[in-house]
Amino acid sequence: IAGNSGKAFKGQRSDGTPVFVKYEMPPIVSVLAREQITPPILSANREAGMGHRVEQEWLNGRTLERQDMGSKQVRQILVRMHYSRILLNQALQMNYTYMKPQDLVHRWQKEAPARLAQNTYLQSICQDLLNHLPNFRQEVATFVHGDLHHTNWVETTSGLVYLTDWE
């Protein structure tokens, strides 16, 4: 299956049911599946020489288009994800950490392509952001996904929408 990891496959269970198989899936996905943000997990186990293997329900449907990102279902999933204390607490138990706003700006400055990082206008925006950031309040921090591109979302033939990429 197309993607950056090279560890995602379409498989088939012994009863012929198609499944999405992923090796080395982040542990948070099981919590996201319970919250109905990602597709249901059918099984998870360790395989010798292959690592952690997860099978998720195979979804027949389509990848969302850019114009779909404002849909009611996408908004509802994001609200559920961003305001779930269960999800945040589970993530913290799995050693995920809080990222403060200044951390995000510093990360961008460090990881942006040189052409963007050297752009004086963007440098001034980063500096302005750093100079005017509000104080970080951990009690209102939320769990977020760093790449909400429309290609990371699927709408099933039955109309359900899931966020699918957690790399």
Predicted regions, residues:
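A conserved alpha-helical element in kinase catalytic cores
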Residues: D15-E55, R62-M81
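A conserved long alpha-helix in the C-terminal portion of kinase-like catalytic domains
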Residues: P27, Q118, S158-V161
